[in-house]
Amino acid sequence: MMRIGLIVTTYNRPDALAAVLEGCLTQTDTNFEVIVADDGSAQETAALIDGYATRAPFSMRHVWQEDHGFRAAAIRNRALAATAADYIIFIDGDCVPPPGFVASHRRLAEPGWFLSGNRLMLTQAFSEQVLRDQLPIHLWSMGDWLQARRLGQIKRLLPLLRLPNLCWLRKRLPQRWQGAKTCNLSAWREDLLRVNGLDENYTGWGLEDSDLVIRLLRAGIFNKSARFAAPVFHLWHRENDRSQLAENRQRLQEALQATHIRASKGVDQY
């Protein structure tokens, strides 16, 4: 059976990370490890992870780097280098997985393809309530979510729908890079290493995941949709500093016109 590594990025938001780790504890498939990819959080986060590690029926590790601003690409690369798992699932530290999340990624994984999943966005007020009252949204039924929709706590129910595993439908847009994000993305580790992981030239918020997907496609690894099979519940957060977004957009445009597969500053540093 293939070994799965679930990489969870976080930065100084232990309450949201706790909700994510609670979701990890209830997975129906427990044959995976969690690597918390920490972009420079304070000691409170380390203590939280230590507490969960003692409860988890799977291995849990904390990979940390110093806080020098938003460096998601770098910490994901460090986490990727720290695991020997065959297959990697990326989520963010504010994206809560339901019980069948890992099992769905395992079921849909296929050589030559990466998986791009979807997310259900929670409103600010509801996210604050979830964290304050420690609501177990990862265990909610469709009836619970219907009530949340009626109350305006979520804007859409569509991401919660389940579709049968029709390969022709999931492989309908194999070259699509738009919309694939590391808040819910999975790939074979050997494919990620082949493209040298994420490009750490992307600093500040935005588009490092798009660059990764573009290079995977260029390497002959295609996009298979995990929508309507493996959603995550995305807690609201304040908008990140986007001061470097224009520079990252320019870098992505250059990447779209280029032919390279490997990141010039990637996982091979570690």
Can you annotate each of these PLM segments?
Residues 22-31:
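Short, acidic, metal-binding catalytic loop of nucleotide-sugar glycosyltransferases
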Residues 23, 38-49, 95:
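A conserved acidic beta->alpha catalytic loop
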Residues 18, 43-51, 100:
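Acidic helix N-cap motif at the loop->helix transition within catalytic regions
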Residues 66-83, 100:
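Glycine-rich, basic loop-to-helix element that forms the pyrophosphate-binding segment
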Residues 3-5, 33, 211:
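Cell-envelope/extracellular polymer assembly enzymes that use nucleotide-activated donors
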Residues 31-41, 61-65:
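Short beta-strand/loop segment that forms part of the nucleotide-sugar
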Residues 88:
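Short aromatic/hydrophobic "clamp" motif used to bind/position activated sugar donors
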Residues 100-149:
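Conserved donor NDP-sugar-binding/catalytic core segment of glycosyltransferases
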